[in-house]
Swiss-Prot record:
This is Protein arginine N-methyltransferase 6. Keywords: Chromatin regulator, DNA damage, DNA repair, Methylation, Methyltransferase, Nucleus, Repressor, S-adenosyl-L-methionine, Transcription, Transcription regulation, Transferase. PANTHER family: PROTEIN ARGININE N-METHYLTRANSFERASE, PROTEIN ARGININE N-METHYLTRANSFERASE 6. GO terms for molecular function: histone binding; histone H2AR3 methyltransferase activity; histone H3R2 methyltransferase activity; histone H4R3 methyltransferase activity; histone methyltransferase activity; protein-arginine N-methyltransferase activity; protein-arginine omega-N asymmetric methyltransferase activity; protein-arginine omega-N monomethyltransferase activity. Belongs to the class I-like SAM-binding methyltransferase superfamily. Protein arginine N-methyltransferase family. PRMT6 subfamily. The lineage of its organism: Eukaryota, Metazoa, Chordata, Craniata, Vertebrata. Arginine methyltransferase that can catalyze the formation of both omega-N monomethylarginine (MMA) and asymmetrical dimethylarginine (aDMA), with a strong preference for the formation of aDMA. Preferentially methylates arginyl residues present in a glycine and arginine-rich domain and displays preference for monomethylated substrates. Specifically mediates the asymmetric dimethylation of histone H3 'Arg-2' to form H3R2me2a. H3R2me2a represents a specific tag for epigenetic transcriptional repression and is mutually exclusive with methylation on histone H3 'Lys-4' (H3K4me2 and H3K4me3). One of its GO terms (cellular component) is nucleus. PROSITE patterns: SAM_MT_PRMT.
Amino acid sequence: MALLKKRKHERSEQDQEYFQCYSDVSIHEEMIADTVRTNGYKQAILHNHCALQGLTVLDVGAGTGILSVFCVQAGATRVYAVEASAVSQLASHVVTLNGMDNKVKVLNSPVESAEIPEQVDAIVSEWMGYALMYESMLPSVIYARDKWLKPGGIILPSAADLFIAPINDRVVESRLDFWNEVKGLYGVDMSCMRPFAHSCIMNKEMAVNLLSPEDVLSFPVRFASLDLNVCTQEEVRNLHGSFQFSCFGSSLLHGFALWFTVTFPGEKTVTLSTSPYGEETHWKQTLLYLDEEIQVEQDTDITGDITLSPSDVNPRHLRALLNYSIGGGLRRTKHFHMGT
């Protein structure tokens, strides 16, 4: 019993830390300024106006309330905007400023303890983090679905897919080469710093950076898919899949990139993509660097599997287990983390 209480206390502290991050304007500015993200949601919601007309919506993790406003614009009669951070007060101001007080009710609460007096026809949420699962807000959406969504109700978005691809990261090479160039700049040889820089950059921490299509060394592989209408808490705790690549040509392989898409239902399907082949989003791509770069050639085979799961220390943080083999060689394993 004492251990259970300790774990609940630790989880409560972790939740408070998470919600505190969303009490700062910077993160909301970044998200709303992301036009791919925000317009994607706006289009998806407005395209579902027939499904939302005159109905009730639950907005999980409402933030500043912009998605709730979109839902009313699409014809929703009532929206419950649930937001656990202090920014819920600003969401109320946004609702008032847009003349929607009589249709949007802002609730300052985690969804797990929210008091919602009725079943809802639709759930909307922008729950995705880096590599889809960082910050682990999806369990809250599943909780809300199981507790309040009517049979036949809709979830926006309704599906998510995770992709992986091998990459060459030119930024890494540039950062490493910098230490060889210092002597030319200042007359001081600092090339001895390169191994240290290498160990700092190509470590076990997942990085978030923007790639170009030229950085991708093979066709991407979808390794995990989620149907938000039916997926369970247990399923989303461990996302696992295998991959097999055939390289396009001669290059240095620095590691692997992860990205995701989410799909919204409706007469006109809307897909929001964080792929390096698409427009830039604030999610960018999540990078898993190998310990050492490896030379690959055209048609070099890369096989393996990957598992994403919550951190044991903080379930809102993320860990990855990567197993891989290059050119039929030794199978290697590397553990990664994002957060603790």
